């Protein structure tokens, strides 16, 4: 960002900021269940259970994404949840679904939900990842590792272990893998968990987009995760880019240079982190011992720069998305104002003269608490005591920690702390001795298992999605296939079977619509959103649309009858001849007479 706006801001706060104080034209608690011919969008208000329709010239789909959940044994058990469910229950319902968690997926979502679970009081036993290396932003991974949560790469989840009455889970079977395929003989059991948090990626929720393109054509646009999975800033930029594109299509005067700038920023915001530095930059030894300073453990270039607005003395700069922040230690006075303003918690303050650390913290800790000082891998470097917690407005606080047995330049190795009683024990995995097979469900809406699909496929190496839908009902439940079809494609591809074609989005695209609601008992009021300043609303005795021979004649006789009609017409042509008498010659005397009388009436 060139000026501080959305960087470091939480997603829901970005939405509130963009919506503004005037909420006109924003309908909350409403879901689109279909897009009808004639560019009519069908909507239902979930609070009032009323159905209404919106007529529009342009459509922008910003429906976000849905979680992708791979198929594994017993994945229908209570205790197996996607990150979306875990987050919603924590953030909206203030409810923890479990206390001991296994997170599947070492990406940004896995890091974020694991971190939030820890904040809420849960214990994340481990994070497993099928890739040989971690994904996501490295600063997010460091934030989780500093809590001593182990991240196990090249591991996959094979099975959830149910309790005695199948009302929950007690463990999981995991295995080492290569190219996401489990290696036989490496299966092990992780016991003592009650929730499996599935964070294996997102897929665009694009069913409305597919149908919108069929109805609106080139006037259908998409923004945010509905078109490409990305961060909040990326969604904001794509929304602005879409708005400019629509304005240009409408013929409005816009700055094309602004459009190019936004487009470039949107592309830059999607880049993967690129490693620039091997180790963080530090001041000279003499400067370290002279006064306090900060260390920025941000080694990768990517689209994030709230830190460049954080220093009141202008000591932090970042020239582009492909560079890392730079600290001018001649300007840095060690005020640590920047420490709490980094969204990735990658800035740390030090005062070697007093053995003091200034560390970002986003969970409750008591002052005078004895803690373990840790590095980015959660390894214990020593002990310290929390002297003071400096509370900040963005809820990222700063803990002033006095190091007890780490001194001098060794302090700069410290990146965080863990309360001694919360430091986890080493992970204990048991070998898998006897396995009880369980069902692998592909479609949770209609309880379609992988075996059900394989029976239909037989010995073939391909099958159409339509045949699967017709024979198994997979993809015909409330989710309309947006979750189960991607799961099925992944599961069958591992067995050398390809699915041909894509499912056609079918209404209702929301499972919250009842058949009786399509014929409402009474007609509601009509609302017009004031997107234009040149429209007016008037009451008429009769409205005639079209000024051709039929329309103008109807206008004449209604006027003669005292109905006070109003006629609207888009262009000239027949109307010019029939209403205004604009043509000097008419093919029939009757037309000339109609034109004469109509002209007099007008």
Question: What residue spans do the PLM features occupy?
Answer:
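Residues forming the flavin
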Residues: 1-292, 336, 414-441, 448-472, ...
């Amino acid at each position: 960002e060139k000026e501080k706006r959305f960087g470091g801001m939480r997603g829901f706060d970005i939405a509130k900021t963009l919506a503004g104080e005037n909420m006109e034209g924003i309908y909350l608690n409403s879901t689109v269940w279909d897009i009808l011919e004639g560019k009519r969008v069908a909507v239902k208000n979930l609070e009032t259970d009323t159905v209404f329709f919106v007529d529009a010239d342009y459509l922008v789909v910003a429906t976000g994404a849905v979680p992708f959940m791979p198929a594994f044994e017993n994945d229908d058990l209570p205790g197996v949840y996607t990150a979306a469910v875990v987050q919603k229950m924590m953030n909206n319902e203030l409810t923890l679904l479990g206390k001991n968690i296994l997170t599947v997926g070492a990406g940004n979502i896995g890091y974020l939900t694991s971190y939030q679970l820890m904040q809420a009081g849960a214990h994340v036993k481990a994070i497993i990842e099928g890739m040989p290396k971690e994904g996501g932003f490295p600063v997010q991974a460091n934030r989780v590792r500093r809590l001593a949560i182990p991240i196990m790469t090249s591991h996959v989840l094979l099975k959830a272990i149910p309790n005695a009455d199948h009302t929950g889970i007690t463990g999981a079977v995991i295995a080492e893998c290569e190219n996401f395929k489990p290696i036989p003989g490496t299966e092990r059991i992780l016991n003592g968990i009650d929730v499996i948090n599935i964070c294996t990626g997102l897929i665009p929720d694009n069913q409305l987009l597919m149908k919108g393109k069929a109805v609106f054509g080139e006037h259908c646009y998409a923004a945010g995760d509905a078109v490409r999975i990305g961060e909040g800033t990326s969604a904001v930029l794509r929304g602005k880019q879409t708005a400019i594109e629509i304005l240009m299509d409408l013929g409005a005067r816009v700055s094309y240079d602004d459009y190019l700038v936004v487009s470039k920023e949107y592309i830059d915001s999607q880049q993967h982190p690129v490693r620039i530095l091997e180790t963080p930059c530090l001041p000279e030894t003499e400067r370290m011992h002279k006064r306090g300073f900060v260390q920025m453990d941000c080694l990768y270039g990517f689209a994030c720069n709230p830190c460049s607005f954080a220093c009141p003395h202008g000591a932090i700069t970042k020239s582009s998305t492909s560079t890392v922040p730079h600290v001018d230690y001649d300007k840095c006075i060690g005020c640590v104002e920047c420490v709490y303003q980094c969204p990735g918690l990658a800035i740390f303050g030090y005062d070697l003269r007093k053995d003091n650390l200034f560390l970002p913290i986003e969970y409750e800790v008591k002052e005078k608490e004895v803690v373990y000082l840790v590095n980015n891998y959660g390894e214990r470097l020593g002990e310290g005591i929390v002297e003071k917690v400096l509370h900040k407005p963005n809820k990222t606080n700063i803990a002033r920690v006095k190091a007890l047995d780490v001194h001098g330049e060794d302090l700069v190795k410290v990146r965080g702390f863990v309360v001694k009683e919360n430091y986890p024990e080493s992970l204990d995995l048991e070998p898998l001795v006897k396995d009880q097979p369980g069902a692998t469900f592909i479609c949770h809406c209609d309880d379609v298992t992988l075996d059900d699909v394989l029976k239909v496929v037989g010995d073939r190496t391909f099958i159409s999605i339509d045949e699967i839908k017709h024979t198994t009902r997979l993809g015909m439940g409330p989710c309309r296939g947006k979750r189960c079809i991607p799961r099925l494609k992944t599961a069958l591809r591992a067995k050398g079977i390809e699915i041909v074609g894509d499912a056609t989005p079918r209404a209702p695209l929301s499972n919250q619509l009842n058949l009786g609601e399509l014929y409402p008992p009474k007609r509601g009021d009509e609302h017009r959103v004031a997107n234009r300043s040149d429209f007016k609303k008037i009451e008429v005795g009769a409205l005639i649309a079209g000024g051709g021979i039929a329309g103008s004649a109807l206008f004449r006789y209604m006027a003669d009858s005292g109905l006070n009609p109003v006629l609207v017409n888009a262009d000239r042509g027949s109307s010019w001849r029939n209403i205004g008498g604009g043509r000097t010659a008419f093919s029939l005397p009757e037309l000339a007479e109609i034109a004469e009388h109509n002209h007099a009436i007008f």
